């Protein structure tokens, strides 16, 4: 079974665009035959998953899940590419620790 990976990008700093580009680069390099990949865009209170058709759907912050085609999806891993807050100050890391979601940054 393929693991579902979040590439978390965006943030609240002026480097938001750089973070989104980094996420796109990672997305293009990771083997989609082995993993279900989704870019999660964060900016302020907007946390959204970019679906394969390009549409976006909100993240449920209670468990970092989302709905796709009527099915609840949960992430097995989060790759943090956010520059500045909340990716480089421990906020996201603490959130993922509380939820038990492994991550890398």
Which role does the model predict for each range below?
Residues 1-105:
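ATP-binding N-terminal substructure of ATP-dependent carboxylate-amine bond-forming enzymes
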């Amino acid at each position: 079974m393929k693991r579902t990976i979040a590439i978390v990008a965006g943030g609240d700093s002026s480097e938001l665009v750089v973070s989104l580009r980094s996420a796109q680069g990672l997305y293009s390099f990771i083997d989609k035959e082995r993993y279900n990949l989704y870019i999660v865009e964060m900016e302020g209170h907007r946390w959204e998953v970019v679906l394969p058709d390009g549409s976006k759907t909100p993240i449920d912050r209670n468990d970092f899940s989302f709905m796709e085609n009527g099915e609840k999806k949960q992430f097995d891993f989060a790759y943090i590419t956010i520059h500045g807050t909340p990716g480089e100050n421990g906020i996201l890391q603490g959130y993922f620790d509380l939820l038990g979601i492994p991550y890398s940054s």
